[in-house]
């Protein structure tokens, strides 16, 4: 049985970067090109409030564009880039050019073998297996 994935820590004061039904780019070479966020793991919100996710959060995505093997399927994914600016503990603000995810297996290992583009330092610290195939960490 795979070990339990770390889902969410403290969410106080976080910028709501991505929400339900946000279209995201898939940054790895798993065959998927574009996906839609359909669920956010570990989110405990208020009734009728739209759930949101941030960098390094685990989400459920539905692949909309890609190879026929992965299209119309659901996968777990880790958010590695978001366009909404967010603040780091040292006071710097950072924002990326696009919203991007990396598809992972149920045990947390990436499905692809390389990641196109940079990934956030927060995602690299929380998901070391994802960071091992990243080309650039910002």
Swiss-Prot record:
CDD domains cross-referenced by the UniProt entry: Ribosomal_uL14
Q: Which UniProt keywords apply?
A: Ribonucleoprotein, Ribosomal protein, RNA-binding, rRNA-binding
Q: Which GO terms describe its cellular component?
A: cytosolic large ribosomal subunit
Which GO molecular function entries does the Swiss-Prot or TrEMBL record give?
A: large ribosomal subunit rRNA binding; structural constituent of ribosome
The record ties this protein, via InterPro entries, to: Ribosomal_uL14 (IPR000218), Ribosomal_uL14_arc (IPR019971), Ribosomal_uL14_CS (IPR019972), Ribosomal_uL14_sf (IPR036853)
Keyword Ribosomal protein belongs to the record = yes
The biological processes this protein is annotated with in GO are:
translation
Please name the Pfam families in this protein's record: Ribosomal_L14 (PF00238)
> What stretch or stretches form a coiled coil here?
none
Keyword Oxidoreductase in the entry? The reply is no
Q: Domain of life of the organism in this record?
A: Archaea
Q: What does this protein do?
A: Binds to 23S rRNA. Forms part of two intersubunit bridges in the 70S ribosome.
Q: Which NCBIfam families does this UniProt record tie to the protein? A: PRK08571.1, uL14_arch
List the PANTHER family hit by this protein, alphabetically. 50S/60S RIBOSOMAL PROTEIN L14/L23, LARGE RIBOSOMAL SUBUNIT PROTEIN UL14
What assembly does the database describe for this protein?
A: Part of the 50S ribosomal subunit. Forms a cluster with proteins L3 and L24e, part of which may contact the 16S rRNA in 2 intersubunit bridges.
Hey, which family's this protein in? Belongs to the universal ribosomal protein uL14 family.
Q: Any idea what this protein is called?
A: Large ribosomal subunit protein uL14
The record's gene field reads: rpl14
């Amino acid at each position: 049985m795979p070990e339990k994935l770390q889902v969410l820590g403290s969410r106080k004061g976080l910028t709501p970067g991505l929400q339900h039904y946000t279209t995201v780019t898939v940054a790895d070479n798993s065959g998927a090109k574009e996906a839609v966020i359909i669920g956010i793991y570990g989110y405990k919100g208020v009734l009728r409030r739209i759930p949101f996710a941030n960098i390094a959060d685990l989400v459920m995505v539905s692949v909309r564009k890609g190879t026929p093997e992965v299209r119309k399927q659901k996968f777990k994914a880790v958010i590695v880039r978001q366009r909404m600016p967010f603040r780091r503990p040292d006071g710097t603000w950072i924002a990326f050019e696009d919203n991007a995810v990396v598809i992972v297996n149920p045990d947390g290992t990436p499905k692809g073998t390389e990641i196109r583009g940079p990934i956030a330092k927060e995602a690299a610290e929380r998901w070391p297996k994802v960071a091992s195939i990243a080309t650039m960490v910002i």
